[in-house]
């Protein structure tokens, strides 16, 4: 919206959740979760561990103005060139629906530059690094001892010094809880206020989109939404951009089925909801003889990139990053081993002060069967079918996770750990695919601009567009794609093509 309003195009922003501000946030893990998280009903299916541990919470995303940018930890690595060419690089894998992106790194580089400058990514464009906290120092010590070469305290979109109207981080460790200090970039802090200041953007919070309508030619013409009291409203539009995350965006298109689009809006390919990805993830926590105090400083404070390059000799395609992660005691108790109790569990919790932690995040394989559908049995408070999230790990994912756990254990043991624990994946924060871009309409939902193949004025502006997931945390790429898309929309509107 900010990019469009800068180009003189009026916008209406519909947000399903409330308009929380940074002053509203609380530095308490569970209270903040209840305040920010998307807790509307959802269903799960498939063999993934999350469906067993958190069947009603397949994803950890935010329902409030600013969306999940208010929750993210701030890591901003870029995709590598080969990750835009997954099918060409990896070849055909049984059970995987790999596809090359319809765009290249060369095309994306100027937009990555713009996104990094907007976010204030550390280690980029002269931005200084964040200080190393104890969790990172343990992490880096182990990295050096096992021979890794590419590790640093970023890049992150949290300020080490004042930048772009945002202060320096006070290192309070509550990035996941919204960041009261505004040192972390989010659309709540930067883009939305600036769009509103242009006088061309109207924000409507508590406005839950339930259907996109179209005219007789098949062009999108309006969005129907419900306010907090359940009253139905219609907002007419020349262009509709959907950014509801990779679960709610396909759900909205499926809910928008009509006689012209009986299987869901923009779904002539049958690909709406398919190829949902959530990154290959897992965590490693290690106990040491002396205190670490991992919770002091940023929630995430460092990245190791040595395992990111594609190297099939490891037994899998693609790669992964290691990233420091610190959960507070209440979150660690819930997520370190869901459902655990007894001596081993209490030993882990008793050692909290002496614990270091990291998150493993890598490229998972797209699969047609990993998909978002409308539930046959569960409805939301408005009486509409909730999203069902079906997911199964691909064999490549299993091999990568096993290998990554072994490498993480080796790193911490090299740093002197006296015990380690392999923590299973959390509810998904990197929700990708499900409305993927494709060169050919039969292979996906969107073209190279994130515009629906079937509906010339319907765009998707979130992680749903990703053709494959890469290993990098996705926010930087999502922002870069959104800037590029807004530029295209503005030019097309001015030329009378939309």
Language model segments and positions:
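Glycine-rich loop(s) and the adjacent beta-strand/alpha-helix scaffold that form part
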Residues: 3-29, 198, 207, 211-214, ...
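N-terminal export/assembly segments and adjacent metallocofactor-ligating motifs
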Residues: 36, 64, 70, 76, ...
């Amino acid at each position: 919206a900010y990019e469009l309003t800068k180009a003189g195009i009026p916008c209406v922003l519909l947000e399903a959740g409330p308009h929380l501000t940074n002053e509203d946030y609380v530095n308490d893990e569970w209270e903040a979760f209840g305040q920010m998280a998307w807790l509307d009903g959802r269903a799960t299916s498939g063999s993934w561990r999350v469906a067993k541990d958190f069947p009603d919470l397949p994803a950890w995303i935010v329902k409030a103005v600013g969306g999940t940018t208010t929750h993210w930890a701030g890591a901003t690595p870029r995709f590598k060139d080969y990750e835009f060419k997954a099918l060409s690089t990896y070849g055909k894998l049984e059970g995987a629906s790999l596809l090359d992106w319809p765009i290249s790194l060369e095309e994306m580089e100027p937009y990555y530059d713009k996104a990094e400058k907007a976010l204030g990514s550390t280690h980029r464009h002269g931005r200084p690094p964040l200080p190393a906290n104890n969790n990172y120092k343990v992490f880096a010590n182990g990295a050096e001892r096992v021979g890794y070469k590419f590790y640093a305290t970023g890049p992150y979109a949290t300020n080490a010094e004042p930048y772009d109207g945002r202060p320096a981080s006070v290192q309070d460790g509550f990035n996941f809880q919204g960041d009261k200090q505004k040192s972390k970039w989010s659309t709540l802090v930067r883009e939305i206020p600036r769009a509103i200041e242009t006088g061309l953007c109207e924000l409507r919070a508590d406005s839950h989109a339930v259907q996109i309508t179209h005219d007789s030619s098949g062009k999108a013409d309006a969005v129907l939404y419900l306010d907090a009291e359940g009253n139905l409203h219609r907002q007419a539009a020349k262009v509709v951009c959907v950014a509801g995350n990779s679960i709610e965006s396909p759900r909205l298109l499926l809910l928008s089925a009509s006689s012209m689009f009986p299987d869901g809006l923009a779904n002539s390919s049958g690909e709406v909801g398919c190829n949902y990805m959530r990154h290959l993830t897992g965590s490693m926590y290690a106990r040491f003889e002396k205190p670490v105090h991992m919770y002091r400083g940023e929630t995430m404070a460092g990245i190791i990139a040595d395992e990111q390059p594609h190297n099939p000799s490891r037994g899998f395609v693609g790669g992964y990053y290691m990233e420091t992660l610190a959960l507070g005691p209440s979150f660690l108790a819930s997520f370190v081993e869901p459902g655990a109790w007894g001596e081993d569990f209490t030993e882990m919790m008793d050692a909290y002060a002496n614990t270091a932690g990291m998150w493993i995040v890598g490229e998972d394989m797209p699969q047609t069967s990993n998909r978002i559908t409308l539930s046959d049995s569960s409805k939301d408070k408005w009486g509409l079918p909730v999203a069902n999230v079906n997911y199964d790990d691909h064999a490549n994912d299993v091999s990568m996770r096993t290998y990554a756990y072994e490498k993480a254990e080796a790193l911490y043991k090299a740093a002197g750990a006296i015990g380690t624990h392999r923590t299973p994946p959390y509810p998904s924060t990197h929700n990708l695919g499900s409305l993927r871009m494709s060169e050919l309409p039969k292979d996906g939902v969107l073209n190279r601009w994130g515009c629906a193949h079937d509906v010339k004025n319907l765009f998707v502006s979130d992680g749903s567009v990703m053709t494959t997931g890469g290993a990098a945390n996705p926010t930087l790429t999502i922002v870069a794609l959104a800037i590029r898309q807004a530029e295209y929309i503005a030019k097309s509107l001015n030329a009378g093509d939309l």
